[in-house]
Amino acid sequence: MAETEERSLDNFFAKRDKKKKKERSSRAANAASGAGGSSAAAGSRPGDGGSLGSGARSGDGGSLGSGSRSGDGGSSGSGARSGDGGSSRSGDGGSAGPAGKAITKDENEWKEFEQREVDYSGLRVQAMQISEKEDDDNEKREDPGDNWEEGGGGSGAEKSSGPWNKTAPVQAPPAPVTVTETPEPAMPSGVYRPPGARLTTTRKTPQGPPEIYSDTQFPSLQSTAKHVESRKDKEMEKSFEVVRHKNRDREEVSKNQALKLQLDNQYAVLENQKYSHTQYS
């Protein structure tokens, strides 16, 4: 892998060096052709020895320059220049043709991007002062889509009549409802009371000592326990009847029923029979 990478790098740099050499040769050829054109232009004046200079520089018309006469100047000079210029230009064009094609191929293969350096040191920056109205106007001009949506589509001339352009009447906002909050009663600090106990006011009654011998406060499971009347028992007797012994009521009811049966004269018929027997006897 290392050898292949080195070969690829060597090939890359070799191609780059070839490209630079070809660019230098093409620049030299262009400079030579430019110099030949300038010398030909200088020797085209009539009456001065232009043919001699042109023949010496081009190398093609040396014989023409030596055989020309100084007296006639205009015709010989023009003939020498035209011949020299034609040969030199055609020769330069022929030599520059294949080199130009090779350069274009290399440029297509390797394109080097040279960033252009721009000097901004001479710029003078000033503080921008733009009002808000101008900003809004510029935004409206730059964003026609927003105006299209807000205005219902385009300008007034572009609007078309139809059911889709009917604007709904603007409804007035409802009046704000004022909610009156009832102030909560002041709570005593340090004591928590549930909501149910906050509203009810309880009066504290004087509470005496507990009645130890009362069955209501201290009920006993013994059937032979003595019942001691207390103040609460007396108060309860005033309102309703207190049943102290479960069998007493039944005994009283049975006695009453027995008395009622005894009060009935069940032997009245027998007594009449006795009286009748006594009479017959």
Curated annotation (Swiss-Prot):
Record PTM: Isoform 1 and isoform 2 are phosphorylated on tyrosines by ABL1 in B-cells.
InterPro entries: CDV3
GO CC annotation: cytoplasm; cytosol; plasma membrane
Keyword Phosphoprotein part of the UniProt annotation: yes
Alphabetic keyword roster: Acetylation, Cytoplasm, Phosphoprotein
Compositional bias segments (type: Low complexity): 27-45, 157-170
Residues carrying Phosphotyrosine: Y120, Y213, Y267
Extent of Polar residues compositional bias: 214-225
Modified residues annotated as Phosphoserine in this record: S8, S131, S155
Modified residues (Phosphothreonine): T4, T205
Coiled-coil intervals, chain numbering: none
Tissue-wise expression: Ubiquitously expressed (at protein level). Up-regulated in ventricles of juvenile visceral steatosis mice.
Disulphide-bonded residues: none
Location of region: Disordered: 1-257
A Pfam family of this chain: CDV3
Compositionally biased region (Gly residues): 46-97
Transmembrane domains' residue ranges: none
UniProt modified residues of type N-acetylalanine: A2
Compositional bias segments (type: Basic and acidic residues): 1-15, 103-119, 226-254
Subcellular location: Cytoplasm
Location (main, coarse): cytoplasm
Similarity remark: Belongs to the CDV3 family.
Protein name: Protein CDV3
Organism encoding this protein: Mus musculus (Mouse)
